[in-house]
Amino acid sequence: MYIEDIIIDGFKSYANRTVIEGFDPTFNAITGLNGSGKSNILDSICFVLGISNLSQVRVDSLQELVYKKGQAGITKASVTITFNNSDKKQSPAGYEHLDKITVTRQVAIGGRNKYLINGHNAQLSRVQDLFHSVQLNVNNPHFLIMQGRITKVLNMKPPEILAMIEEAAGTRMFEMKKNSALNTIEKKQKKVDEITKVLAEEITPTLDKLRGERTSYMKFTNNQTLIDRLQRFIIAYEYYTYEKKLESSEFESFKAEIDKGQKRKKDLTLKSTDLKAKISELAKQREKETNLEEMDQQEQKLSKELVKYQTSHKHQKESLDKEEGAINNLANTREEIKQSIQQKQKEKQSMEKKIQSIVEENQQINAELKTLQNKHNTMTTGISTGADGSSAAEDGSYTEQLMEAKKTAVNAASEYKQAEFRVKHLQSELIAKRKAITQEQTDHKKLQAEQELVEREIQQLTRSIQELQLDNSKQQELTEKKRQLEPLVSKLREEVGNASAQLSGLEFNYTDPSKSFDRSKVKGIVANLITLKDVETATALEICASGKLYNIVIEDDETGKALLSKGQLKRRVTLLPLNKVEGRSIDPQKIKNAQKIAPNGAVKPAIEFVEYDKELQPAMNFVFGSTFIATDKKYAQKAAFDSSIKVRTISLEGDEYNPAGSLTGGSRPPSGSILTQIQRLNENNRCLRENQSQLEHINFELVQLKSVTDRFKQLEQQLNIKQHAASLIAQRFQLNPHHQLLESIKEMEKSIESDTQLITNSMIKEKEALEKVKQLESQVNDFQSIRESQLKDLEKKIQITKEKCIKSNKIVKGEQVFIEKLDLEIQEMDNELENLSKETQGNQGTISKMRKDVDTLARSISETNKQIQDIRETLSEIRKDMAQKNDAIRSLHQELEKIQSEITEIDMSTEKLKSRMNRVDKDRQEASKWLEAAIKKHTWIKNEKQLFNRPGSDFDFNATDPSKANSEYIKLQEEQEKLSKTINRKVMSMFEKAEQEYQELMEKKKIIENDKSKIEHVIRELDEKKNESLRTTWKKVNKDFGSIFSTLLPGTSAKLEPPEGQNELFGLEVKVAFGDVWKETLSELSGGQKSLLALSLILSLLLFKPAPMYILDEIDAALDLSHTQNIGMMLKQHFTSSQFIVVSLKEGMFTNANVLFETKFIDGVSKVHRTVFNKKDKQVGKKK
């Protein structure tokens, strides 16, 4: 099958209907300038073949295939290809009867897309099947070779080259089928898994459950037979026992024992009366004695008073000692203050003398300043000039300056000499005072030690107070808390009392059945043992529990028996022993189903809404375990009546939905839910316990802190006293001779330092004055020339003198201020002396009063001691006498108790015997009635009565223990009762059906697994055949590959071989030889040589299974003319049965073609011209 002609209309650059006819069956070439439309011819062929990847035809949408996208008035693109089908061997499947096949594809603006085969509409799938059957798959186009594909082949890895061989061999289809088969296996495996899952999750559990039910059913039938046999045995034993009771003689023996006991009781009663009379007489004699209890109380009272007096006396004595010490300290302080006043007055007088000399010095400085200012004025004003040119006044002025300078030098010398004398005198006096201070050091050290001691005591007291400060603050805080808690506890106690009164029915009162009874085994009423997680569920939970809310939870059945028999219960109760009660719970699957129909926890088991101790789990399951609670009536109704759930459900409003079909609801008690009230009572009880415990703890801490508080106050008082003592010591320091000597030494050291500085300054002053004398003497004859400089010097001196004057004025004022300060200090000391005198007078009165109190307390202590001694002597005598009488009474009481105990035992024995007599009599009557009733009810007794208790018979009571038989009977009855509730009476038929389903599924599973095994076996066989076919293909392609490459590039050879260390099934790589030398890599090849190598490989693959048509699009673009010509020759030589359509721009390629089509672009439209090459290379042209 090959192309005969192509009709293009409105497709891409072919605006008008263009018929391209006369295609050669073997070799056709298309050439033309770039953009002339040569590649559009190839695009039109791909378009008809049904290409889906439009990027290969260089457009993004079908509308772009229309000429100028329909903007030039052409709205449809159509391509028709006529195929010659005369060679029936290459004919598509189903078209062997046709010699020509016409395929048309049209696309219009707006998206209409249409296919026609021989003028008839066809689906895309039909068109694709037509071309696929002759290896023309345009969406996987091996027949279409483009330059880009050649480039890809150069970069392929060994597995990718192997994949091309597989494609050529056709084993790719096998891989697809293999993958499909593997998918089938996977599906079958999923089916097996589903069957396994159904077996594991549904059938097997159901079968196991039915097996268990079948076992239970068979056990039920066997138990029933055994129960019937045991029942006859037990009835026979009871009949035998009752007969023996009728023949018993216990009644007479009991009566004889009673008479004997009554006689003994009469004798003991007479003896008891005599003992009571003796005890009464002794008690009267003891009561006549002095009242011992009153005397004991009086002794205790006096002892307390004595301790009180002794404590007060001690405290008063200590306070008196302190006050007397304080008076002595005040006297010492007054004396020290008087000495300080005298010292200050002396210091004032000394300062007044000192300031007088300073004032005189100040006046001298002022006079010097005035003289300098006058001299300055004289020099500034000037005097008339004499014949020699000098001024007499100025001469006189210089003379005055000269005299003044000499005077200054003399004064300065006098000053430093006087200062040297004073320094010498002060130094000698300083030595003397330092000796004196050493002598006074003892008293000073003593005073200093006293001050350090007081300061240490102050520090110690301060630390103690700081340590107790926290406790003092804590006491205030605790007192405030106590004030807040007391009314709160009182209020809570009242609320708990009122609530307890309203809920008095929820109390369980009983008497201990025995002395060793453990009350912890009685857990309490159910309502008191739970805590609600949500108060809103209270009504629903109360409806759920109903009467069980008031049941009593106990640890075991033995506790229950003890309570019922000996607990003296005042009302009828229901007990729930934890070891016996059967907890019921909802099936987990039903809970899951409920959660599906009511999302977000709208339906939950009632037990999830309460909190309780884990040990109470069985009882809580019994009360709440089998009911749902729903947040909404809608969900409650669904949970109750849904076929997959059917569980009793209660809404939050209290409406009950029963799966049996009943609905219960209505009004609620106005007092509210009992559970809510209990919850509130429990919460109040908890708060009361917490607050009461907190209050008790606070009271306890306050009691402990009371002593701490007293200690804190005492320490504060002591600290104040010590601080006052410290201030007095400080004042004594000021008046101490040692201290005064220290101050005097400091003043003398200052004076020495000042005079030393004065000596230095005076010597400098003298030196400056002498220099000035020399200078004035040299300047007298030349006054006019230096007048200006002298004026400046004079002004400078005036400035210095002014500063001295100001400084002197400040010193005078400072000294005057110091004298005023001394006056104030003297006045303050006088005031303090007056205050101390007043304080001393006040303390004298206090001491006098305290001495009287101490004496009074001492007398009280003496008198109280005497009273206590008298009372103790009297008490000793009375106690001795009473001890004797008490011993006698105690002895008589012991004897009386023995008699009373024996009488009680006789009474109890008599009561027991009477009870047993009554019981025996009653038993006889009951036995007679029971025997009569048993014979009527069980007719078999008459016939088998002679066998009762006969050895070897079914009623051998010695061989079979009746009590064990009875226990076994009760146990079987209980077991039978449980089984009757749970057994499935249809289990036998259900088990057979389930087992049949199980066998069927197992058979299906076996079949599927066999099918899977067969498919896997076939795949293994086909894998072997595929590998064989692949090897055959490889050899054929390898041969053609070398032949084609040798044709394209003479003198070379090429082959495909596996990578080193691997076989051909893992991959193939290309090897090239130039001459006889094989190259290790392809890197030595030029670009053109690599392109020829890749093209050779592609063509060798195509040659293995030739398609009817091949399209080559500019594959020679990278090749020179010689190689291009070789390609044309190779195509003619190797591809004789396929049609080639080659697009090329090189003459070496298309000169080998039989038909050449040239494209041109004229007036915006592509045109085609056909040229036929004959064997003599003559051209025949025809324009289309």
Curated annotation (Swiss-Prot):
Residues 520-639 form the SMC hinge domain. It is found in: Nucleus. Belongs to the SMC family. SMC2 subfamily. GO terms for cellular component: chromatin; condensed chromosome; condensin complex; nucleus. The lineage of its organism: Eukaryota, Amoebozoa, Evosea, Eumycetozoa, Dictyostelia. This is Structural maintenance of chromosomes protein 2. The keyword Iron does not apply. It holds the Pfam family SMC_N. Central component of the condensin complex, a complex required for conversion of interphase chromatin into mitotic-like condense chromosomes. The condensin complex probably introduces positive supercoils into relaxed DNA in the presence of type I topoisomerases and converts nicked DNA into positive knotted forms in the presence of type II topoisomerases. GO terms for molecular function: ATP binding; ATP hydrolysis activity; chromatin binding. SUPFAM superfamilies: P-loop containing nucleoside triphosphate hydrolases, Smc hinge domain. It comes from Dictyostelium discoideum (Social amoeba). Keywords: ATP-binding, Cell cycle, Cell division, Coiled coil, DNA condensation, Mitosis, Nucleotide-binding, Nucleus. Gene3D superfamilies: 1.10.287.1490, 1.20.1060.20, 3.30.70.1620, P-loop containing nucleotide triphosphate hydrolases. ATP binds at residues 32-39. The gene is smc2.
